[in-house]
């Protein structure tokens, strides 16, 4: 009993984390949105993918990507160590399972910056934990303009990215939520609202079953 005569509060356990998969065509803003989301939420971490591509200037192994060889990557595929993996522009990318599930079980939310195929694979592997959000650009013309202004790709690569953008966008209806990124602040606000709502879902709180049982026994 507590000092005021009421039963002592029942311990409320840690919630289960959310696997938040963000997808969009290249240049639609999902990377910037995910970084800002992380900066505003201390319990949110970014899933660090493994890749066979070479590090770009300023990238840190284990922070931006796990940079591994093709042989190492293929061995991990054989050992079923990835939630999902894909070959993009001749390079392999994959999402390691172990660190992700450790974070989720510890009550942290994990953000994934992945394509539609990766989002599908993640949802199939962890249907109760995964939440898929698609980020749409206001228009394809604006998307192409953003890619050109970045100055990172050749004209040929931009052309290929635009073709891939249409394919990516065609899968928008497979997602749980869709955000049109025509205003960054509003798009970020919507993303935070989605995360906060998903955190409240019953399945994220496994402690509730024991909590309710205890109430019923009073």
From Swiss-Prot:
It catalyses: GMP + ATP = GDP + ADP. The keyword Kinase applies. PROSITE patterns: GUANYLATE_KINASE_1, GUANYLATE_KINASE_2. Its EC number is 2.7.4.8. GO terms for cellular component: cytosol. Its main location: cytoplasm. It holds the Pfam family Guanylate_kin. It is found in: Cytoplasm. Residues 17-196 form the Guanylate kinase-like domain. CDD domains: GMPK. ATP binds at residues 24-31. InterPro entries: GK/Ca_channel_bsu, Guanylate_kin-like_dom, Guanylate_kinase, Guanylate_kinase_CS, P-loop_NTPase. It is an enzyme of class 2 (transferase). Keywords: ATP-binding, Cytoplasm, Kinase, Nucleotide-binding, Transferase. It comes from the Bacteria. Essential for recycling GMP and indirectly, cGMP. Belongs to the guanylate kinase family. This is Guanylate kinase. It comes from Maricaulis maris (strain MCS10) (Caulobacter maris). The gene is gmk.
């Amino acid at each position: 009993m507590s000092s005021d005569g009421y039963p002592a509060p029942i311990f409320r356990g840690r919630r289960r984390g959310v696997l938040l998969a963000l997808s969009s065509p290249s240049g639609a803003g999902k990377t910037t949105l995910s970084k800002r989301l992380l900066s505003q939420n201390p319990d949110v971490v970014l899933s660090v993918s493994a890749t066979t591509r070479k590090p770009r200037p300023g990238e840190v192994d284990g922070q931006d990507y796990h940079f591994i060889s093709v042989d190492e990557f293929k061995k991990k595929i054989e050992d079923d160590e990835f939630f999902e993996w894909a070959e993009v522009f001749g390079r392999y990318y994959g999402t390691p399972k172990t660190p992700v599930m450790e974070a989720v079980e510890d009550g942290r939310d994990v953000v994934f910056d992945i394509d539609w195929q990766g989002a599908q694979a993640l949802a199939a592997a962890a249907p109760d934990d995964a939440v898929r959000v698609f980020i749409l650009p206001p228009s394809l013309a604006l998307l192409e303009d953003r890619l050109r202004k970045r100055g990172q790709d050749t004209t040929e690569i931009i052309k290929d990215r635009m073709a891939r953008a249409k394919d990516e966008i065609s899968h928008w209806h497979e997602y749980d939520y869709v955000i049109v990124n025509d205003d960054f602040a509003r798009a970020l606000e919507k993303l935070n609202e989605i995360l906060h709502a998903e955190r409240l879902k019953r399945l994220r709180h496994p402690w509730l079953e024991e909590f309710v049982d205890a109430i019923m026994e009073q």
